[in-house]
Amino acid sequence: RKESSAASDVYKRQTFVKIMILYTRQEDTKKMKIVDEYFGCDVFSTSAMQRYLPHAVYKQMMDVMEKGKELPKEIADVVANAMKDWAMDKGATHYTHWFQPMTGITAEKHDAFINPTGPTSVISDFRGKELIKGEPDASSFPSGGLRATFEARGYTAWDPTSLAFVKEKTLYIPTLFCSYDGSALDKKTPLLRSNDALNKAAVRLLNIMGYNIHKIKTTVGPEQEYFLIDEDMFKERLDLLVTGRTLFGAAPVKGQELDDHYFGSLSERVKAYMEEVDEELWKLGVYAKTEHKEVAPCQFELAPVFTSTNIANDQNQLTMEVLQKVASHHGLVCLLHEKPFDGVNGSGKHNNWSFCTEEGENILEPGDSPKDNIRFLTVLAAIIKGVDEYQDLLRISVASAGNDHRLGADEAPPAIISIYLGEELTAILEAIEAGNEYVDTIDRKLELGVSTLPPIAKDSTDRNRTSPFAFTGNKFEFRMLGSNLNISCPNTILNTIVAEELTQFADELECVKQEDMTKALIALIQKTLKNHKRIIFSGNGYSDEWKKEAQKRGLLELKTTADALPHYTDPKNLQLFEKHNVYSASELHARESILLTNYYQVVQIEAKTMAYMLRKQILPAIFSYEAKLAQIIQTKKSSGIEAVSYTHLRAHET
């Protein structure tokens, strides 16, 4: 009866969801919003600033946001008041300093705009000091020993380069989080420091090379994978509720064997969910662009258009939050765990990274003739060198207990770091190293054999899905990230590594005359390739042969998080981060401690959950089934029916 009642409840819920989807579709058809008209409507954007700020203050704010100038204290009150007026016009009653502590997820504390003016009266107020600084309890967040209960003071500091927004009647102000002594206690502060380090190093090198460049910025487009499952089914699984993944279970009769889920047609329920997700993200200024079914059943992906790394990081945090919150509106649960189900693919987050000039010119764009693009080839050589020298840091940047289940499991890149460049770039670099002239032999037209179709232009590189760090036309795609990872750490490390190599190149080229620059650059590229070409690999990263070859080349294979994390504070890594003012020694040691603690706590929680389920759910079910079988056997015996053992039956098989 209980099972029948539960099934009836599920049927009623599903019917209700279908009716609501149809109703929502009809209502949406009536109002048919145009995205252009409401995109970013909940963001305190530059157009909103123009409307709410005096012109002189607006210009100063643009200098802060675009040129990195310090915010004058005298305009802080004006900006805060304008921000409050805009937010209240959007229905906001509270504000919060929105930050990203070392938990990897966002944190917020909501304060109302009201201030008392009498026994029963208030005034809405928001001042510059409240905008610029907040004070949460730093000891209540992971700090790796940087803070304790008896020294708990911490500060949040407004980040004016990431736009404030309104969500659920609250003004969200993106902020940094630091301790009383200025130590970074969050994910965002080191990311901004690494952006500064890369900007400084890249501008210096490019100007030495003869390019008049004043500023560069890194850009990222993170592709977000996730699973959707029915909410009622989710609630039946204690392991999913507690750990985000299944700890027990049987393989389904049909998984992903037929390759028929990838890019498949979307159900009405999922389509309605995606439409609501898109609308919520577009209101928040997130460039949600592409969505589709992924390889595993019930797995999907959402990919945005790239934007500056700091904003991309904030927007990815918003994306994960919206994906999970909107799911409940449709009777669904969004799973962001890296490996929620055994036997099918897990979920990752491809990090598409590049950097460009202040005019928007992509430094990693090879152009029509990559072999003649000496700027691109120089930067490419620096990246190759950096990835080879700091394999351990790139592996550490994606290390987690959940991601260990994905990496190297024939669904995600292996734990061995390598670079894939594609046929053309690999051939160009081989020719440069050998001192030969590169001859282009690649056929760039694809003939489909259909008379009505013209030839299709073919990319110069194929797509190697097994490579952890692949060049994909005008960017590098770092594919090792787990689906729920905060992208700040991988990008902080990547920025710092590249900043170091560009600095070394600049040191070597600083005294070279301009007329000798091309010759010096080619010699530098040749030397770099001779020393670091071992990191370049174009084959199948899933194969056992590659593991053997990688060992011969001397590449690291840090299979698990426990193998990788102790390398975080190796002397060369400490020196790297301190040199570029990204982490101090204490900040780096703290992060190593936090990650190790998180690793064993996650594993411990999973073990406790398994033991509880075994004792309270699985063993009682087994004992109950055994009792039923024993009762059946006893009933048959009392009826004169002889029980035949399984072993006896097998003995008669031929």
Please provide the spans of the model-predicted regions.
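Active-site core of metal-dependent hydrolases
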Residues: 21, 38-151
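Gly-rich Lys/Arg/Thr-decorated short loops/hinges at beta-loop-alpha junctions or inter-strand turns
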Residues: 35-45, 254-262
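Glycine-rich, acidic/polar active-site loops that bind/position phosphate-bearing ligands
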Residues: 151-336, 345-348, 354-593
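C-terminal substrate/ligand-recognition segments
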Residues: 604-625
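Generic long, charged, amphipathic alpha-helical segments
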Residues: 635-649
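A short, hydrophobic C-terminal helix/tail in secreted or cell-surface proteins
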Residues: 651-654
